[in-house]
Each structure stands twice: as C-alpha cells, then as structure tokens.
C-alpha cells in the first residue's frame, strides 16, 4: 500500500525555500586560522586583511599592499621587461606555460612582482611587492628582471627602495635560470648601497627558500609582519631531517626578532608610518657626507645578463 503524499513537506516547503532562497557569495565569510572566528569578508578587506580581535595577519595581494602604502592609494606602475615564457620547455604534471596562463588569469598579473613609484608620507618612494598568489610568489627570470628594474627606478629617481617579500623560493620550472636571479638581485642591492639609497625589506608570511637566501636578507633594515614564517627550509622539512620536534614559534617573525635576524616586528597598520619615518631618517643621513666615507660612484657597476 502506497502512503499518501505529504503535500506540505514535499510540495509546499520546497516552493517556499525556492521563493525565499538567497544567493550567498562563497567568500562572504573569512575564518580566522587562530581562533576559528568567522568574520565578514568585507570587514577583513577594509582592515587590510587583518582579522579584528585576534589580529591574525592574512596574506595580502601585491596590489593591495601598494594601495595601502602609497598616499591616497595612487601610484605609477613601473613597466617591467618581458622575458622568455618557457625557456626550458618544462613540464611536470602540467606544462609550465599552462601554469603561467592559470596564474595570470587568477591574479591579473604577468608574474609575481608588482613595482610602483609614488609618495609615502610625502616622501618619493619605489616599492616592490611580491604576489604569493602567483605560483607561490616564486622567483624566476621575470621576477629577477622586475626586482632589478625596481632598483634601477630607485637609482634613477634617487628614492628609497622598499620590498614586500612573499615567496616560496626559486621557481623550479626555470631551473638554473631561476637560481641566476639570486646573484643578479644581490648586485642590484649593492648598487643601491653604493648610491647611498635606503633598501628596506618587509618580510611577510611566508618568505622562504632562495628569496630568503638572497635579496630578502640584504636590507639596511628588516621589518616583519607578526607571525610571518621566515626561513630557508621549512619547519616540516627540518623536523623530518633531524627527527626532532622544533621549538614553538621557530622560524616565525617574533623568534627571529629575539635572535637578531629581524630588526622589528611591525603590525600591518603601522607599516606605512614606520617605513616613512625610517626612510626619511635614512635619506637625511645619507645626504650628509660622513667623515671617512668613500664618494658616490659616478658609474654603477653593470648587472649580469638574465640568461
């Protein structure tokens, strides 16, 4: 015997649900990794991607960083040179060119660097920001060229050079051509130093691998955001190698500050003011010749070719 249909639950209720259904955006809420607290996405975005209450610093896009730093959120994009897209014809599970296409569609950027020129606290400044969303901010030929172009812009305009580092390291799909960018960027930093221009590095979460082993640790001043992972090899790799449990907070910004690897841990909301003050002081000092210092070189040393 077939039971009579419950028309209220099977007919009326679904229609009511359909009538009053509201589309909920997938990114309406953001969950705090520390506390599990759910916060409106818009509220977190307006707070520069810092969770209110817990003060957990989430990852931030390169464009958002430039907007946060430059006065009135406006700047001039520094044109970046083009490089060969796939010099080694590399393929793993996917072709490298396909990975690049996906990353460009996802971020709207040609590669993992964005360079801007503008004013910060009325002081002219050149800022480079790495985009972790683009293949984990990995350093390849395009990234190396971008960093060097940023340094050249700072040299040309006589401004401080500020870097927001966020990277998983060298880009394996470019092999030795990626590793070549480590000495190239180091030479660019030397040119800034020879010209007596400040180079400030802000270490964000995460800054690892070949980036840590090169330009991210060559600043005149090293700032870090709270809780940022800063290392060459990650804690999981080290634990598997030495078969020991690492101390709590190992390789985090606060740990490195205690051990002299970082000068200051700065909340994201205070970064603009801190960097503006530091660069202002350093530019004033470096305009005044110090006794016993060598004169500025008139011809900077050339950079090696990218490939």
Swiss-Prot record:
The lineage of its organism: Bacteria, Pseudomonadati, Pseudomonadota, Alphaproteobacteria, Hyphomicrobiales. Acetyl-CoA carboxylase is a heterohexamer composed of biotin carboxyl carrier protein (AccB), biotin carboxylase (AccC) and two subunits each of ACCase subunit alpha (AccA) and ACCase subunit beta (AccD). It catalyses: N(6)-carboxybiotinyl-L-lysyl-[protein] + acetyl-CoA = N(6)-biotinyl-L-lysyl-[protein] + malonyl-CoA. It comes from the Bacteria. Residues 292-307 have a biased composition (Pro residues). The keyword ATP-binding applies. InterPro entries: AcCoA_carboxyl_beta (IPR034733), Acetyl_CoA_COase_Trfase_b_su (IPR000438), ClpP/crotonase-like_dom_sf (IPR029045), COA_CT_N (IPR011762). The gene is accD. Its EC number is 2.1.3.15. Pathway: Lipid metabolism; malonyl-CoA biosynthesis; malonyl-CoA from acetyl-CoA: step 1/1. It is found in: Cytoplasm. This is Acetyl-coenzyme A carboxylase carboxyl transferase subunit beta.
């Amino acid at each position: 015997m077939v039971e009579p249909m419950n028309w209220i639950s099977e007919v009326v209720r679904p229609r009511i649900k359909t009538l009053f259904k509201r589309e909920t955006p997938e990114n309406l809420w953001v969950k705090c990794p520390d506390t599990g607290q759910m916060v409106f996405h818009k509220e977190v975005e307006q707070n520069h991607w810092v969770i209110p209450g817990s003060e957990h610093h989430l990852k931030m896009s390169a464009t958002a960083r430039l907007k946060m730093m430059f006065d009135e959120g406006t700047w001039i994009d520094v044109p970046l040179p083009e490089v060969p897209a796939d010099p080694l014809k590399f393929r793993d599970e996917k072709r490298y060119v396909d990975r690049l296409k996906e990353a460009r569609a996802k971020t709207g950027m040609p590669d993992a660097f964005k360079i801007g020129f503008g004013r910060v606290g009325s002081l002219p400044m050149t800022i480079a920001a790495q985009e972790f969303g683009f293949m984990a901010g990995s350093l390849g030929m395009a990234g190396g060229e971008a960093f060097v172009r940023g340094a050249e812009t700072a040299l040309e305009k006589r401004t401080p050079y500020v870097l927001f580092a966020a990277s998983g390291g060298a880009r394996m799909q470019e092999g030795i051509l990626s590793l070549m960018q480590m000495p190239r960027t180091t030479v660019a930093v030397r040119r800034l130093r020879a010209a007596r221009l400040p180079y400030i590095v802000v270490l964000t979460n995460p800054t690892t691998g070949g980036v840590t082993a090169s330009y991210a640790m060559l600043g005149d001043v090293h700032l870090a955001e709270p809780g940022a992972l800063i290392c060459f090899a990650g804690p999981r790799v080290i634990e598997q190698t030495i078969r020991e449990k690492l101390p709590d907070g190992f390789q985090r910004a606060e740990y490195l500050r205690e051990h002299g690897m970082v000068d200051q841990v700065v909340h994201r909301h205070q970064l603009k003011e801190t960097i503006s003050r530091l660069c202002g002081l350093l530019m004033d000092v470096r305009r005044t010749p110090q006794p016993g210092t060598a004169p500025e070189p008139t011809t900077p040393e050339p950079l090696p070719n990218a490939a």
